[in-house]
Amino acid sequence: MSVMASDKACAPVRASRPFPKQKLRELVLQALYALEIDPEGEDSLVSLLMTEASVSKKNAAYALMFCRAIRANQPDLDALLDATIRTTTLARLTIIERNILRMMLFEHQQNQDCCPVPVAVLIAETTRLIKKFSYSEGSSLILAVLGSIFDHPAPALDAPLEPTSMCG
């Protein structure tokens, strides 16, 4: 028996692979961006995500669910961000930067009760998303804003994500 044949026989078999949280965050960010550019485009967003990101309909719809929850909480998220940003305004940031801030702040606040995501993970993900979708020069402001907010207890959200969260 060859080594490859024995490796295949011993390899664990999974029914389906879980959707990676990093990929979910990327899809949510892309959906937030698309809806900020075209607020009326939600109807075609699932098919757009399926085509452009090569994901299943289920995963695209799952990302859209998070996008809707973030948008439902956007006034509260933006108020907290505006109160924290000192050197500029939220409106002067790029669309991607604003939406990275909103998404990470939402995830931080959403998951406080059930399964908090460590702040270090959120900061690392923020850095990764900035490098992938924006420019690295903007990262210092984004990270400073999130760091300042994460140092304080998270206020409750008016419209929490139900029935699940980004926990799993």
From Swiss-Prot:
Report what the protein is called: Transcription antitermination protein NusB
Q: Which SUPFAM superfamilies match?
A: NusB-like
Recorded source organism is: Chlamydia trachomatis serovar D (strain ATCC VR-885 / DSM 19411 / UW-3/Cx)
Q: Which HAMAP family match?
A: NusB (MF_00073)
**Key word Transmembrane helix present:** no
State one Pfam family annotation. Answer: NusB
Reading the lineage from the top rank, the first entry is: Bacteria
Q: Which InterPro entries match?
A: NusB-like_sf, NusB_fam, NusB_RsmB_TIM44
